[in-house]
Protein backbone atom coordinates (compact mmCIF):
# COMPACT_ATOMS: atom_id res chain seq x y z
CA UNK A 1 0.00 0.00 0.00
CA UNK A 2 1.09 3.53 -0.79
CA UNK A 3 -0.13 6.74 0.82
CA UNK A 4 -0.47 9.68 -1.55
CA UNK A 5 -0.85 12.78 0.60
CA UNK A 6 -2.12 15.91 -1.09
CA UNK A 7 -1.46 19.06 0.92
CA UNK A 8 -3.88 21.95 1.15
CA UNK A 9 -6.15 23.88 3.47
CA UNK A 10 -9.50 22.30 4.35
CA UNK A 11 -11.99 25.16 4.14
CA UNK A 12 -13.96 25.66 0.92
CA UNK A 13 -12.67 29.23 0.62
CA UNK A 14 -9.29 27.69 -0.27
CA UNK A 15 -10.67 25.58 -3.15
CA UNK A 16 -8.89 26.27 -6.45
CA UNK A 17 -6.09 28.22 -4.78
CA UNK A 18 -2.46 27.70 -5.68
CA UNK A 19 -1.71 26.39 -2.18
CA UNK A 20 -4.31 23.63 -2.59
CA UNK A 21 -2.84 22.05 -5.72
CA UNK A 22 -2.02 18.93 -3.66
CA UNK A 23 -5.72 18.54 -2.86
CA UNK A 24 -6.54 19.11 -6.54
CA UNK A 25 -4.27 16.23 -7.54
CA UNK A 26 -5.65 13.66 -5.10
CA UNK A 27 -9.21 14.81 -5.91
CA UNK A 28 -8.54 14.23 -9.61
CA UNK A 29 -7.06 10.79 -8.92
CA UNK A 30 -10.07 9.79 -6.83
CA UNK A 31 -12.44 11.00 -9.56
CA UNK A 32 -10.50 9.18 -12.30
CA UNK A 33 -10.84 5.91 -10.38
CA UNK A 34 -14.45 6.44 -9.29
CA UNK A 35 -13.56 6.81 -5.62
CA UNK A 36 -14.63 9.39 -3.06
CA UNK A 37 -13.25 10.72 0.20
CA UNK A 38 -14.53 9.88 3.66
CA UNK A 39 -13.26 10.52 7.17
CA UNK A 40 -10.06 8.71 8.06
CA UNK A 41 -8.85 7.53 11.46
CA UNK A 42 -7.34 10.87 12.32
CA UNK A 43 -7.44 14.43 11.05
CA UNK A 44 -7.67 13.50 7.39
CA UNK A 45 -9.98 12.36 4.62
CA UNK A 46 -9.13 9.19 2.71
CA UNK A 47 -10.08 7.60 -0.60
CA UNK A 48 -8.91 4.19 -1.76
CA UNK A 49 -7.98 3.37 -5.35
CA UNK A 50 -6.31 0.37 -6.96
CA UNK A 51 -3.99 0.62 -9.95
CA UNK A 52 -2.28 -2.41 -11.47
CA UNK A 53 -2.79 -4.43 -8.30
CA UNK A 54 -1.31 -1.67 -6.11
CA UNK A 55 -3.52 -0.09 -3.45
CA UNK A 56 -3.21 3.65 -3.01
CA UNK A 57 -4.77 5.54 -0.12
CA UNK A 58 -5.29 9.14 -1.14
CA UNK A 59 -5.04 11.41 1.90
CA UNK A 60 -6.23 15.00 2.43
CA UNK A 61 -5.27 16.42 5.84
CA UNK A 62 -8.11 18.28 7.54
CA UNK A 63 -5.61 20.31 9.51
CA UNK A 64 -4.30 23.49 7.99
CA UNK A 65 -1.27 23.21 5.73
CA UNK A 66 1.17 24.19 8.48
CA UNK A 67 0.00 21.28 10.69
CA UNK A 68 -0.08 18.56 8.02
CA UNK A 69 2.38 16.37 9.90
CA UNK A 70 -0.28 15.34 12.43
CA UNK A 71 -2.48 13.89 9.69
CA UNK A 72 0.45 12.19 7.93
CA UNK A 73 1.60 10.45 11.12
CA UNK A 74 -1.97 9.34 11.93
CA UNK A 75 -2.51 7.95 8.42
CA UNK A 76 0.86 6.17 8.41
CA UNK A 77 0.17 4.61 11.80
CA UNK A 78 -3.36 3.50 10.94
CA UNK A 79 -2.41 2.02 7.57
CA UNK A 80 0.91 0.64 8.89
CA UNK A 81 2.89 2.35 6.15
CA UNK A 82 6.58 3.25 6.30
CA UNK A 83 8.17 6.49 5.04
CA UNK A 84 9.33 4.84 1.81
CA UNK A 85 5.68 4.16 0.91
CA UNK A 86 4.43 7.75 1.09
CA UNK A 87 4.40 10.49 -1.52
CA UNK A 88 3.56 14.02 -0.39
CA UNK A 89 2.16 16.34 -3.07
CA UNK A 90 2.42 20.10 -2.58
CA UNK A 91 2.74 23.46 -4.29
CA UNK A 92 6.15 24.99 -4.88
CA UNK A 93 6.57 28.72 -5.29
CA UNK A 94 10.15 28.22 -6.49
CA UNK A 95 9.11 26.23 -9.58
CA UNK A 96 7.52 27.80 -12.64
CA UNK A 97 3.84 27.12 -13.15
CA UNK A 98 3.31 23.98 -15.18
CA UNK A 99 6.37 22.10 -13.93
CA UNK A 100 6.80 19.34 -11.40
CA UNK A 101 9.69 17.84 -9.47
CA UNK A 102 9.81 14.46 -7.80
CA UNK A 103 12.34 13.95 -5.02
CA UNK A 104 13.12 10.95 -2.83
CA UNK A 105 14.00 13.17 0.13
CA UNK A 106 15.13 16.68 0.94
CA UNK A 107 14.46 19.89 2.78
CA UNK A 108 11.15 21.67 3.07
CA UNK A 109 12.37 24.35 0.68
CA UNK A 110 10.22 26.97 2.36
CA UNK A 111 7.02 24.90 2.12
CA UNK A 112 5.48 24.94 5.61
CA UNK A 113 3.40 21.80 5.13
CA UNK A 114 6.55 19.85 4.25
CA UNK A 115 8.36 21.49 7.15
CA UNK A 116 5.76 20.24 9.63
CA UNK A 117 5.78 16.74 8.13
CA UNK A 118 9.59 16.62 8.44
CA UNK A 119 9.32 17.76 12.07
CA UNK A 120 6.54 15.25 12.83
CA UNK A 121 8.36 12.31 11.24
CA UNK A 122 11.77 13.36 12.53
CA UNK A 123 13.09 12.80 9.02
CA UNK A 124 13.14 14.31 5.55
CA UNK A 125 13.49 10.88 3.94
CA UNK A 126 10.15 10.56 2.21
CA UNK A 127 9.17 11.14 -1.40
CA UNK A 128 7.54 14.35 -2.51
CA UNK A 129 6.05 15.72 -5.68
CA UNK A 130 6.32 19.49 -5.93
CA UNK A 131 4.06 21.26 -8.39
CA UNK A 132 5.23 24.66 -9.61
CA UNK A 133 2.91 27.62 -9.12
CA UNK A 134 5.21 30.59 -9.87
CA UNK A 135 4.25 32.90 -12.73
CA UNK A 136 7.57 34.33 -13.89
CA UNK A 137 8.18 37.37 -11.74
CA UNK A 138 6.30 37.41 -8.48
CA UNK A 139 3.49 39.96 -8.44
CA UNK A 140 3.73 42.70 -5.82
CA UNK A 141 2.37 41.84 -2.40
CA UNK A 142 2.94 39.07 0.07
CA UNK A 143 3.77 35.48 -0.74
CA UNK A 144 0.81 34.32 1.34
CA UNK A 145 -1.70 36.37 -0.66
CA UNK A 146 -0.22 34.89 -3.85
CA UNK A 147 -0.27 31.23 -2.77
CA UNK A 148 -3.72 31.63 -1.24
CA UNK A 149 -4.98 33.31 -4.41
CA UNK A 150 -7.08 31.50 -6.98
CA UNK A 151 -5.78 30.43 -10.37
CA UNK A 152 -6.66 32.66 -13.31
CA UNK A 153 -8.43 31.02 -16.27
CA UNK A 154 -5.12 30.84 -18.18
CA UNK A 155 -3.29 29.38 -15.19
CA UNK A 156 -6.05 26.80 -14.69
CA UNK A 157 -5.55 25.49 -18.24
CA UNK A 158 -1.82 25.06 -17.58
CA UNK A 159 -2.41 23.47 -14.19
CA UNK A 160 -4.99 21.01 -15.55
CA UNK A 161 -2.41 19.80 -18.10
CA UNK A 162 0.20 19.61 -15.35
CA UNK A 163 -2.14 17.61 -13.13
CA UNK A 164 -2.50 15.02 -15.92
CA UNK A 165 1.26 14.47 -15.91
CA UNK A 166 1.31 14.48 -12.12
CA UNK A 167 -1.36 11.76 -11.98
CA UNK A 168 0.78 9.61 -14.28
CA UNK A 169 3.84 10.29 -12.10
CA UNK A 170 1.95 9.27 -8.94
CA UNK A 171 0.82 6.01 -10.52
CA UNK A 172 4.39 5.37 -11.71
CA UNK A 173 5.66 5.96 -8.15
CA UNK A 174 3.07 3.53 -6.78
CA UNK A 175 3.97 0.78 -9.23
CA UNK A 176 7.70 1.29 -9.82
CA UNK A 177 9.06 3.42 -6.96
CA UNK A 178 10.39 6.93 -6.61
CA UNK A 179 13.66 6.42 -8.52
CA UNK A 180 11.85 5.17 -11.62
CA UNK A 181 9.28 7.97 -11.43
CA UNK A 182 12.01 10.60 -10.97
CA UNK A 183 13.98 9.29 -13.94
CA UNK A 184 10.92 9.34 -16.16
CA UNK A 185 9.02 12.46 -15.09
CA UNK A 186 11.73 14.86 -13.95
CA UNK A 187 13.29 14.68 -17.42
CA UNK A 188 10.09 15.77 -19.11
CA UNK A 189 9.63 18.61 -16.63
CA UNK A 190 13.05 20.16 -17.23
UniProtKB/Swiss-Prot annotation:
Protein EC:
3.1.1.29
Q: Which reaction does it catalyse?
A: an N-acyl-L-alpha-aminoacyl-tRNA + H2O = an N-acyl-L-amino acid + a tRNA + H(+)
Q: Which residues form the active site?
A: 19 (proton acceptor)
Q: Which InterPro entries match?
A: Pept_tRNA_hydro, Pept_tRNA_hydro_CS, Pept_tRNA_hydro_sf
> For the site Stabilizes the basic form of H active site to accept a proton, which positions are given?
91
Q: Which NCBIfam families match?
A: pth
- Role description: Hydrolyzes ribosome-free peptidyl-tRNAs (with 1 or more amino acids incorporated), which drop off the ribosome during protein synthesis, or as a result of ribosome stalling.
| Name of the protein described by the UniProt record | Peptidyl-tRNA hydrolase
Q: Which organism is it from?
A: Chlorobium luteolum (strain DSM 273 / BCRC 81028 / 2530) (Pelodictyon luteolum)
Q: Name the encoding gene, please.
A: pth
Amino acid sequence: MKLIIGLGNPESRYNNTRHNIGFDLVDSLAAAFGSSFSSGKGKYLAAKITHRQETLMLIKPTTYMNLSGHAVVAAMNFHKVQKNDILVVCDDLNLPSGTMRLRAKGSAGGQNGLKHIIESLGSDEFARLRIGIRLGEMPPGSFSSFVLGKFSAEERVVMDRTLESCREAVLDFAKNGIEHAMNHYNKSAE
